Structures are given as C-alpha cells and as structure tokens.
Amino acid sequence: MIVRDLSQAEKTDRRVVSKGWESTRLLLKDDAMGFSFHITTIYEGAELPMHYKNHLEAVYCISGEGSIEDLATGQVHEIRPGVLYALDKHDRHVLRGRTQMVMACAFNPPVTGREVHDETGAYPLEAEMA
C-alpha cells in the first residue's frame, strides 16, 4: 500500500514549478501503478500550449476556472470544478487559467518525475531522456 500526504510531498523533489504552473507528483513510474497521478496548479492568467505526443492524460478540475482549446478543431471547452477532460488522442491544446485552477491529473504511461515540457509542449518518453 502506498500512502502519501500532499502537504509533505510538496516539500520534496516531487514538486515541480514551471512558468504558469506547478505540479506535485504523488505517484510516479517507480510506484509501479501503471500511471502517474499529480495535483497540478495552473496559475491565474496562464496560457499553456501543450501537446503530449507520448502520453495520455486525464484531468479533473478541483477548483478554479479556465478553458481548454482543441487546436485541431478550434473548439473551446470551459473548465470549472467538477469538469474532467481526457486527452485521448494526443490532442494539441491550449490550457488557459482564468483564475488559479487546481487539477488532479493522471498520465499513461506514467512519468518518472524528471520530465519537463519540451519546445512543443510535450514530455519526452523515458527512453528519450536517457
């Protein structure tokens, strides 16, 4: 059994801070769950173009408001508490925080914890990081 406290994990290298967001990775690849699980904060006013070419992601909004734009269709979906979106086709998107948003995120394959977004907004595969 794995038990982790978010407030404790935030004080470790599981917390990653970047421009427009921060994320605490509560489950990582080494936990052998088949996915990683993160609590991510999107800062108010952030506009984050992303394209997870190597990962699928599901995101549930806990608090805050914003939007996600599907760059293939131009469709914009509102995000608010209780809304989930799933990037099931490696969707190119822009995430915008109208207010600070707290999100619960699951990634498959799981991240290792060392990833940073590349110039296209993607996380590389672990093999590409070696």
UniProtKB/Swiss-Prot annotation:
Belongs to the ectoine synthase family. Keywords: Lyase. PANTHER family: L-ECTOINE SYNTHASE (PTHR39289:SF1), PTHR39289. Pathway: Amine and polyamine biosynthesis; ectoine biosynthesis; L-ectoine from L-aspartate 4-semialdehyde: step 3/3. Catalyzes the circularization of gamma-N-acetyl-alpha,gamma-diaminobutyric acid (ADABA) to ectoine (1,4,5,6-tetrahydro-2-methyl-4-pyrimidine carboxylic acid), which is an excellent osmoprotectant. It comes from Phenylobacterium zucineum (strain HLK1). NCBIfam families: PRK13290.1. One of its GO terms (biological process) is ectoine biosynthetic process. InterPro entries: Ectoine_synth (IPR010462), RmlC-like_jellyroll (IPR014710), RmlC_Cupin_sf (IPR011051). It holds the Pfam family Ectoine_synth. One of its GO terms (molecular function) is ectoine synthase activity. The gene is ectC. It catalyses: (2S)-4-acetamido-2-aminobutanoate = L-ectoine + H2O. This is L-ectoine synthase.
